[in-house]
Regions:
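HDAC/HDAC-like amidohydrolase catalytic core signature
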Residues: 1-176
Length: 176
């Protein structure tokens, strides 16, 4: 059975700005390194491109008023009151395409979960995922939409049990 490599160039739309510590070009560098080592063309690998997660799926965890703010911020300008939702200068800046990019990342985690759950892949690697600090009503720790929670809930809705093992340097507080 194959390993699914979930990849999209749309992840490059996450542009936190030149002074932000999270540099999303690392995703492109990672992909090019995987290509250089031949990992993306191995017979046991399959490259899968995600679709944006449907808003109704994102709304299964995130509050409607928070999603309204994310959508309003998609043009690159923070709407009035955005700071109440964790948006603004610092950890979670507003940038053009914020909502669109967050939906693609969430879609990648949902795709990875579904490929494994359905038996179409033995494992899946979604290296843009794991934005585990977003809360139902606010962004936190560079995370706008909690793709980990969405994938876990997707699997649980199918009656599957999930063990979430987080090996990040700090606590994935949006998942608890």
């Amino acid at each position: 059975m194959k390993t699914a490599l979930v990849h999209s160039d749309a992840w490059q739309r996450f542009d936190y700005g030149p002074e932000h510590p999270l540099r999303m070009e690392r995703l492109g560098l990672t992909w090019r390194l995987m290509e250089a080592y031949g990992l993306t063309t191995l017979p046991q690998a399959t490259v899968q491109a995600p679709e944006p997660a449907p808003e109704r799926v994102i709304a299964s965890y995130h509050a409607p008023e928070y999603l309204d703010v994310l959508k309003a911020a998609n043009g690159g300008v923070a709407p009035r009151g955005a700071e109440r939702y964790g948006l603004g200068p610092g950890d979670n800046p507003v940038f053009p395409g914020l909502w669109d990019a967050a939906r693609v990342v969430a879609g990648g985690s949902l795709l990875a979960a579904e490929l494994v759950a359905s038996g179409h892949a033995a494992r899946a690697f979604h290296f843009a995922g794991g934005l585990h600090h977003a809360f139902p009503t606010r962004a936190s720790g560079f995370c706008y939409v909690n793709d980990a929670v969405l994938a876990i809930r997707h699997l649980q809705a199918q009656g599957l049990r999930v063990a979430y093992v987080d090996i990040d340097a700090h606590h994935g507080d949006g998942v608890q």
